[in-house]
Amino acid sequence: MFSKNKHNTKFIVIACVIVVLILILFCLDFQNIQEIIETINQLTNNQNPSQNTASEMSGMRRKIIFFIFNFFGKIILASFVISFLLHIKKNAQIKRLKNKLSLWSKLSFHVSQIGEEVLNELPIGIVLIDISSQEIQWLNPYASFILKNPEINSPLAQINENMAQLISTSDAIPKTIITLENKKFECFYKKDLNVFYLFDATEKEQIKHLFLQKTLALAMITFDNLAESLIRYDLSEQSQIQGEYLSALSDYIEPYEGYLKQLIDDRFLLLLNRQNLDKMLENKFIILDTIRNISYKYQLKVTLSMGIACWNLSYEKLATYSQNAIELAQKRGGDQVVVNIENEKIKYFGAKIASLSKQSKVHARINAQNLVDILKKHPHCFIMGHTHTDLDALGSVIAFYKIATTIHPESNNYIILDEEKLDKSLIPVYNQLIKTEAKTSLNIITTQQASKMIKDNSLIAVLDTQTKDMVNSPELLSLTSNVVVVDHHRATEEIIPSIFSYVESSASSTVELLVEVMGFLEKEVHITAFEASIMYAGILIDTNAFIYRTSSRTFEVASKLKDLGADAIEVKSWLRKDFDKVLEINKLISEMEIFMDRFAIIQSSEIYENRSFLAQVAEGVLNIRNVDAAFMIAQIADNKIAISARSYNEINVQTIMEQMEGGGHLNSAATQLEGTNIKTVTDTLKHFLKLEYEKGEKNMEIILLTDIPNKGKKHEIIKVNNGYGNFLIQNKKALLADKTNLAAIKQSQMLEQEQKRNHELLMHKLKQEIDDKKITLDIQLGPKGKIYGKITLKQIAEEFLKVHNITLDRKKISLEGEIIAIGIYPVDVFLTDQIKATFFLNVTERKSK
């Protein structure tokens, strides 16, 4: 289109030039034209034409013919000039085009050569596949070399599974790192061309790994309950016990080359790098067991908690992350380590005993006062528990509603409950509540109603959970920033942001915390007998009939609820099982699997919509001797599988469930998983149980850092007993043979071999420069031709440097014997054990002047 418009423009310009030229010629010949016209007029106006002589007519014809020839001659001449100029211009354009074509031809040749070199010579692997069959169609020589010469039409999955997985990824530019014979390759997949590109990234990954290993980790360490536990001892005993704790902590840190600084009596700061942190992770922080054993020895309730952050951030932010981690560890009950590593999910270690209660009456009173102050500022309160509301959640919701109503009797406070979100076992109790407690039931609203009523200054109370995903109505949390949380579960990293949080993981239930708060209010809280029964049932369920997480304060709260009219018989009737359920539980238990001689795993392909039934099965299995933990696995809906876990004190099912995207308490926890099946979930559960509880061997594998007589050489991997192995590790004579250290030693050996090869090449080159060279030393001779003094190796080295500008180590120079006379002597230079160079020394007599 552009070319056509350009051609039309040229034509118009030329036509305009011709028209202008004709007009100019007319102007130039205007006088001649005027004369011809006058002559014609005279001849025409002559009344007697016969009088027009032949000569006049002939003259007129000559003028006209001359004018025509003159006029058109000029036009032809001008056209010729224009054509000539256009011809020159066109030839110039043709010449330029020929030059461009020649240049393009040369460039095309070079580009073709470069492309061929890229395909065949440069270290870039290129693999072309058939997308339908996922088979290799073509690959360049470098790709063939690194992939070990695969045959054409070979399935890609057989050659490298990681490459095959890139085909189905949804990333815009799928890429991954693959390992091929100790080398790392960056692999890119270009979807539109069905081509893989492989680049050697070994050095890049090594640098990245080294940088990662040197990343700073900051840890906050606290001894839980130390001051409270030591208060009954005298000063000397306190110093002795505290010294034993500190000594154990110091001994634990020493092999990891960390910097330990005591901040106050029970709080410490630890600095170390990522490499040593990984070793701690592999050993699962055995310091927790050591501190627990010391506490058991003195009958103390002292444990250790650590919060570790390892991020490539400023020190200030890193310290904040570490502080958040230690706070999370303490919210979860202490006796554990919380590790927050960049780009990794938060890890939890320890927590093998129930949470130690730090709560005192003073602590409860302070929290009660803070809660009252907040409620006074916000007269309109919306209260909700967790989804799949059960008796413990309902009891805590009612308890908080009663507290809010007591503080603001004239205001409307609301309980948010959706019938479709209730646990099926709760529906009969809920229906009875609606009938029995008319005043309370009037203020029960749905999520949809609440969304229209909540304002910016409204208050939302979240009870019996801290996790946004577990809340009955998570969408309501965005309607106001005024949120309070009261819970007794161990915290996770995904806690709900709040203006006030009262979390006590050592409490039996949220009901226990709220009933204690009632005792510190200025006004008496009016609770009906039926409401007290619901709260009592909540405690009963959370403690499994006062077995787990039960303290004297739990019984105080239960006693108070009994005084308020709680009916234990009615509660028992709510918790009774149907006959069909009992048969189903017994059937499932009869088919259970005992794993690792201590864990019961029950599976069912049936769909159980009632989640509490799964918990009942797990709790029933715990009554069997030698079962330390029970896991009930079943479908609760299409494409959704749940695990209900129960255990005794020594097994922490919470940490197991957290690794499977769940949570809970030390002895009762659960999770829900989507997009999987029973077998996969069971295999995953067994994997985590093995990692956590499988007993290690009495011997350990270590990597020697120096030669040990009768044991092995440097970098050798040997197996020794744990005691001797730990001794060598603490004295920095060995490293634990874990994946990190093995990789580091392998990398060190590869580096040493590379350096050795480079050194040998350098020595061979130096040998070539030294061989057959000659130097001369002029020596003064005695009367009988003997040499005065002695020719030293230092003299030889200095003379060689002077003559040939090569520095020799005189310790590596060797002579066959002592030089005692003039002559030519061979001199050997031992560059390495296997490389020897030889030059010649000419000893001559010094001429006297």
UniProtKB/Swiss-Prot annotation:
Cellular component, GO annotation: plasma membrane; ribonucleoprotein complex; ribosome
Every GGDEF domain range: 214-342
Name this protein carries in UniProt: Membrane protein-large ribosomal subunit bL9 fusion protein
Membrane topology: Multi-pass membrane protein
Family classification: Belongs to the bacterial ribosomal protein bL9 family.
Additional information: The large N-terminal domain has 2 potential transmembrane regions and a GGDEF domain.
Keyword Ribosomal protein carried by entry: yes
Keywords for this protein: Cell membrane, Membrane, Ribonucleoprotein, Ribosomal protein, RNA-binding, rRNA-binding, Transmembrane, Transmembrane helix
Main location: membrane
Subcellular compartments: Cell membrane
Sequence segments annotated as region (Large ribosomal subunit protein bL9): 681-849
Stretches that traverse the bilayer: 11-31, 64-84
Residue segments, region Unknown: 1-680
Molecular function terms from GO: rRNA binding; structural constituent of ribosome
Function: Binds to the 23S rRNA.
InterPro entries: DDH_dom, DHH_sf, DHHA1_dom, GdpP-like_PAS, GGDEF_dom, Oligoribo/pAp-PDE_c-di-AMP_PDE, Ribosomal_bL9/RNase_H1_N, Ribosomal_bL9_bac/chp
GO biological process terms held by the UniProt record: translation
Domain of life of the source: Bacteria
